[in-house]
Amino acid sequence: KGRYFKEFLEFYRILDGYIGQLKELLADDTTMIIASDHGFTELKYEFHANEWLRRAGWIDYRKNGKNGLENVSSESMGYSLIPGRFYINLEDRELDGNVKLEDYENVREELREMLLGIEGPEGGKVMKSVEVNEDIFEGDQMEIAPDLVALPNDGFDLKAGFGEKKDVFGKGPRNGMHTFENASLIIDRPGVSIEGSNLYNITPTILTLMNIKYDPSVFDGESLI
């Protein structure tokens, strides 16, 4: 339990009361939806992805005094942006790309295997999974999608940032962080099942409740009603 455990419980108790008051003000035929876009978990370590890449020989920096993406040298094989996005320094795509297209698949798979093998300071894998872009993205903007997306195990926060760091693993002021799982969804309408639902379902559901016509093909999710 954290230092302010009791204070947070009291905060949520008061917030719950306000939600109850709002519910009482709604007409009987009005549906209330309460949703969060993430869950929570304990934070043990921050993982500085670009520092890990630097120590693995995958990223190098220009000696220009800058501390951003423009500081990544043409000798680099890849870099990371938050949250857990990894880009291969691909020729003719990146500003100073040097990985040839014919080598792309092998380089990407090598990085993926390296990421999956990372262990934390206390043992245990840092990454829950590392996905290739074509398995999770589609559409007209694929050219700007990351080449790999890393999902951490609970307790690890994937950081980016450029420039040399003292350590690959660090600790910040927080002891909690967001997760992609365990988000909350409440729909107080009889007959609605939220089992297996996700964020993609929220907008179509709201549009259906408001009797607004829409083209289902433009959404990845479906209405829950």
Where are these regions (language model features)?
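Hydrophobic alpha-helix feature that most strongly marks membrane-spanning transmembrane helices
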Residues: 27, 116, 120, 168-171, ...
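Short, low-complexity, polar/charged sequence segments that are solvent-exposed and flexible
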Residues: 52-55, 105-108, 167-172, 202-206
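Glycine- and acidic
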Residues: 1-8, 187-192
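A short beta-strand-to-alpha-helix junction
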Residues: 10-13, 44, 60-82, 97-109, ...
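Secreted, luminal/periplasmic, and some membrane-associated catalytic domains
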Residues: 2, 6, 20-161
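Low-complexity, glycine/alanine/valine/leucine- and proline-rich hydrophobic stretches
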Residues: 151-203, 211
